Amino acid sequence: MTFYLERGYIQQTFCGSHCLNFIYKGAINMIYVGIDVAKDKHDCFAMNSDGEILIEHMTIQNNFDGFNSLFNSISLFNESFDNIKVGLEATGHYSNNILNFLTSKGFNVYVINPLQTNLYRKGQSLRKTKTDKLDARFIATMLISDNLKPYSNLSYHISELKSLVRHRFRLVHERSKFKTSLSRLVTLVFPELEKIVWSISQNSVLYLLNELPSAKEISECNLTHLTSILEKYSKGKYSRDKAIEIRELARKSIGTNSRSLSFELKQVIQTVLFLQSQIDDIDKELKTLVNELNSPIMSIPGISYVSAAFILAEIGDVNNFDSPAKLQAFAGLDPSTYQSGKYTATHSVMVKRGSKYLRWALLNATRLVCMRDKTFNDYKNSKLAERKHYFVALSHTTKKLIRVIYYLLKTNTSYQLQKVA
């Protein structure tokens, strides 16, 4: 179906089984544009507040020309972009580019959870029909009926945080795999070492094994040079005495002197160090972004920049949650419930649905908060005194932390014991 966007032209559109003719006369109260986002192309639909269809179906390519075509089409509808609402689904990285393009042009863009769109579509029709064309139309209709909030500067910061924290999560996961390989290789080439150092993953040990990747090489190393390596990378914690202890142990080691194992060990160590440097760089960026947000949750003792970044990135706008219980459910920290007839289970497990990143961040943050704040530590100990398992007690304490975080974000106030304990 062709359509004309020039002012004064008669425009014919198709709506279900009805054909609607109207004259586009310029200024219209509100324009609603729905975009169904895909990898290579996007389907668009537009209507005004009177229900008149301006674009029945328009497909644009996911490229510069496609974006400009959409911009030119929408711009003709109304001189003021304040009267134009554009909606699209949050489809991960597929929606990022068109979202940034539209916001840079000054449009009010509304990012909608795909679950909301799905529920809305089911509520509008009993037919099991789902097409990109229909989805674009449903999104436009939701802009009229739903109380949605436009993408904002806060949304931008949250989006940036989310991208970085998830990248960090993946890198930490990769580093963990290589640390497992490191442990295996050290067990083969110098198994006695891990008994006399705090961790084989600490910098002093990594740099030592990177230069001397076998017990044989360590046993033959000059004591002065060995001491120099340990002192430099342990920042003075290891001295000549530790160097002597390590060298003597290396001379009695049962470890395998293998060229291939030593080579693999060096490469694994270099990968661990590289991943660590990347994680450190991400942490610097996270600190900058968290400082720009100036969030009150940083006032909670034990909440680090990294923890705050994960929590803020996953929560997004706290006003999307009606209560702390809703936020708890989003984190997947709800207890499961099983009931059948007269039977109700007395023991339940954590649901573990929702954001795994938020759940991980909250549980880790709770451990640190308990170390720094007496109120939280006492609460955890009270649960332990009830003979609850440590992780059950930690889960209860995490729920308390969620209530505190919710209160601080809702009221934009700093943490004060007498108010939130």
What are these regions (language model features)?
Residues 1-421:
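A detector of single, family-specific signature residues
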